[in-house]
Amino acid sequence: MENFLEKNKDNFAKIQVPLKIVRIKKSTLESDGFDFAAQIPIAANTQNAIKASDLSASVKYYQEFEKISRELTTSNGDYWFFERARGSYKAEEDKFIGQRKGKNIFRTKYPKEKMFDKTDLAVSALCWDLKPMSACKGAQLAFLEFNEGVKERIPDVKEVKELICKWLIFSTLERRLKEENRKNPRTIVNYSIYLFSKKYGNRIEWSEIWSLQKVPEEILYPLTELAKKLDQTIRRNMGNEMINMFARKDQCLELVDRAEISLDHPFETSRYIR
């Protein structure tokens, strides 16, 4: 500021700068579990476009999830990158700028396809937890619901691995449907994972999926076929509504539950399902 004033001799005396003062009650500051740092962006978020998930970067669950996930070596020798704070992947990547082959070194360790954020985690987890309607409400609302269930907990290695594997199946199915030019694949993926989890969620060999670090075709192919049938069923019955809006209604969930779509074969013969 001093340097600026030395170079600029204009009169700035009449310039007004808006200032927001947030007053926090002493009782609130002294209450158990109050995180002062986490409350600053929440109090300041009146005009800026800050997303709900951005305000939870300091929640201990996500801090520990990030720490564990960054330390888990995969069978491929690379790592998953959980983006606890928006833009952290690029920020970490930029640290390698200037180094010889720096960006390649970073992306070899943390491949772009193995980066996911808090909303990805939330939407996927809700579907596996049999809450597809919540997942279909949008990334931020889905995150708020997921956050309520985890913000007071600390994840362990087993939970982190399982949630990453769930995201791996979720995102791989979505990518497969996109490759086949399916419209609004996320909605169909939400309900496909819901149906799959409803029957097999507690029987999947997550340690096998983690070791493989990809979705085996014996699961991905029938899951893709399930998604196609589900897509047809929903579109035939949604009337004039947009599929992403219809998917938020009880009517859609009831329709999916009533749909006569067999899940027995070939899932029952897969070595990844016990």
Task: Describe these PLM feature segments.
Residues 3-274:
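Accessory terminal alpha-helical modules
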